[in-house]
Amino acid sequence: MAKPRNAAESKAAKAQANAARKAAARQRRAQLWQAFTLQRKEDKRLLPYMIGAFLLIVGASVGVGVWAGGFTMFTMIPLGVLLGALVAFVIFGRRAQRTVYRKAEGQTGAAAWALDNLRGKWRVTPGVAATGNLDAVHRVIGRPGVIFVGEGSAARVKPLLAQEKKRTARLVGDVPIYDIIVGNGDGEVPLAKLERHLTRLPANITVKQMDTVESRLAALGSRAGAGVMPKGPLPTTAKMRSVQRTVRRK
């Protein structure tokens, strides 16, 4: 009797897993459509660019197929449709991301939000230091080493960065320490270019060393005032943030 029961349980588990996957797929499609609708309202050039790119690639593929003739013509058409759809989706994703960053620019907690959305093996600790004016320093551990990212008034953030670098250097030894101020002033990194700036830093330590550094710095905790920092941009960009999350999943 055990075997039939196990077989029935296994079948039920598979059916439940399939139902969960289908439900998740439906939810992703609904989120993607919502993201597209929101972006289309924000960006009047989105549809012309997407349609233009799709038609251009399909037309080029058809032209190549007709020129080559034979079986190639029948393979180039579906290939062109797939490639055109892919390029159109890439255009949508890039423009949606640009809109999200534009709306978040200058808002309190925007840098922390951007760091939280980093792709890759980054270890982010938001608000390791802050002031009562909502200036903040966030700590990132990655292959480059330790990176401190400040947001707010540069005059108030620079002393915070110096303090964090000093007390961190005592624990990490020769691991490189970088500091960045997010903003549009001289020597600052715009919010939209923060991820690109981080990924262009040299890889100085291994993933194993990252674990060691993270363990050492965990004991530091956060300085006074860090708790007043919000964990993301102000609520006005909540809907547009879902655009970026959905596009990233796809």
UniProtKB/Swiss-Prot annotation:
The chain crosses the membrane at residues 51-71, 73-93. The keyword Cell wall biogenesis/degradation does not apply. Pfam families: DUF4191. Its main location: membrane. Residues 1-19 form the signal peptide. Residues 226-250 are annotated as: Disordered. GO terms for cellular component: plasma membrane. It is a multi-pass membrane protein. It is found in: Cell membrane. Keywords: Cell membrane, Membrane, Signal, Transmembrane, Transmembrane helix. This is Uncharacterized protein MT2276. It comes from Mycobacterium tuberculosis (strain CDC 1551 / Oshkosh).
